[in-house]
């Protein structure tokens, strides 16, 4: 059995998967905000409960936001303060007496989708998250590509390309990102960015679902806004695809529920790619909230 943990700032979610990659059981508990011992105990108790339920010593994989293992072996995860700065993988491996694997939660999302029955035919899968921020991951032949610093797939911190400024205007505001840089694309392409763009052009503060509802009703402003957003997304994604050249792009996050993105994006990409480039298949993520647990569990399928 494969145990996958999706750990965030508010919850620890465990999913248990069998050899056919089917979800057999899941449970969620609150993430301890303080106290490393309490955090370790919460994870170990869930593992013990799963072991007892299935009468097996399952493998353990964990997806967590941040850098799973820094140079000194500690975790960096600002959203999980109880464990940040601690040697989480080593401590859990010792307590559970088994190999524990950690990876970035965005990599786990991409890995979950790459192991979907429909998508295993594709050697190089790119996961793209359009949610509160913009992120993602790359999976090659069923294995996540992490890079030396676990920042492979941090697409949101690429800067606006010159074609974006040609589209939006060279006086377009370069917003300061939380990372400290100017013009990171997640400030324009995330759910927050989608809403900010609308307010920037129409001086009306609306949230993404409200704008999408207006678009569905045929509102002219919302229609123009979506056209502009999709063109900007195509410009930025074109740069990424020129570097990565994936077979498949799977889009997750809140904006993935907006069908115009997955249905209209492919037609906008060719003019932003090399003439010989093939537009990859673009699909909406299949596994929703279970994706983080699935991908974490499948870290043990990558041997």
Swiss-Prot record:
Q: Name one GO biological process term.
A: N-acetylglucosamine metabolic process
Which residues are recorded as binding ATP?
A: 4-11, 133-140
Q: Is Iron-sulfur included in the keywords of this UniProt record?
A: no
Short name of one Pfam family: ROK
Q: In which pathway does it act?
A: Cell wall biogenesis; peptidoglycan recycling
Q: EC number(s) for this protein?
A: 2.7.1.59
Instruction: Kindly state which keywords UniProt assigns to this record, in alphabetical order.
Output: ATP-binding, Carbohydrate metabolism, Kinase, Metal-binding, Nucleotide-binding, Transferase, Zinc
Q: Does the keyword section mention Ligase?
A: no
GO-annotated molecular function? ATP binding; N-acetylglucosamine kinase activity; zinc ion binding
Known catalysed reaction(s)? N-acetyl-D-glucosamine + ATP = N-acetyl-D-glucosamine 6-phosphate + ADP + H(+)
Q: Which InterPro entries match?
A: ATPase_NBD (IPR043129), N-acetyl-D-glucosamine_kinase (IPR023505), ROK (IPR000600), ROK_cs (IPR049874)
Q: Which residues bind Zn(2+)?
A: 157, 177, 179, 184
Protein purpose: Catalyzes the phosphorylation of N-acetyl-D-glucosamine (GlcNAc) derived from cell-wall degradation, yielding GlcNAc-6-P.
Family, per the entry?
Answer: Belongs to the ROK (NagC/XylR) family. NagK subfamily.
* Protein name per the record: N-acetyl-D-glucosamine kinase
Q: Which organism is it from?
A: Citrobacter koseri (strain ATCC BAA-895 / CDC 4225-83 / SGSC4696)
* Gene that this sequence comes from: nagK
């Amino acid at each position: 059995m494969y145990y996958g943990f999706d750990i965030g700032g508010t919850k620890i979610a465990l999913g248990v998967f069998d050899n056919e990659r089917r979800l057999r059981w899941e449970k969620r508990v609150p993430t301890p905000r303080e106290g490393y011992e309490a955090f370790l105990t919460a994870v170990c108790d869930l593992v013990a409960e799963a072991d007892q339920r299935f009468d097996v010593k399952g493998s353990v994989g964990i997806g967590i936001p941040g850098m799973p293992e820094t140079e000194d072996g500690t975790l960096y995860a600002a959203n999980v303060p109880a464990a940040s700065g601690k040697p989480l993988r080593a401590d859990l491996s010792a307590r559970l007496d088994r190999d524990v694997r950690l990876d970035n939660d965005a990599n786990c999302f991409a890995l979950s989708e790459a192991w979907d029955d429909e998508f295993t035919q594709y050697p190089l899968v790119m996961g793209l998250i359009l949610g509160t921020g913009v992120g993602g991951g790359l999976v090659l032949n069923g294995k996540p590509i992490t890079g030396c610093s676990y920042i492979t797939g941090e697409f949101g911190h690429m800067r606006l390309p010159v074609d974006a400024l040609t589209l939006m205007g060279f006086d377009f505001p370069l917003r300061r990102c939380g990372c400290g840089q100017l013009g990171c694309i997640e400030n324009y392409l995330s759910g927050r960015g989608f809403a900010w763009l609308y307010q920037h052009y129409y001086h009306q503060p609306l949230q993404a679902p409200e704008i999408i509802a207006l678009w569905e009703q045929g509102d002219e402003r919302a229609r123009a806004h979506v056209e502009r957003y999709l063109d900007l997304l195509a410009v930025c994604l074109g740069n990424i695809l020129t570097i990565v050249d994936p077979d498949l792009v799977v889009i997750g996050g809140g904006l993935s529920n907006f069908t115009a993105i997955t249905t209209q994006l492919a037609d906008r990409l060719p003019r932003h790619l090399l003439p010989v480039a093939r537009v990859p298949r673009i699909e909406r993520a299949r596994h929703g909230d279970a994706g983080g647990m699935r991908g974490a569990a499948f870290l043990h399928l990558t041997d």
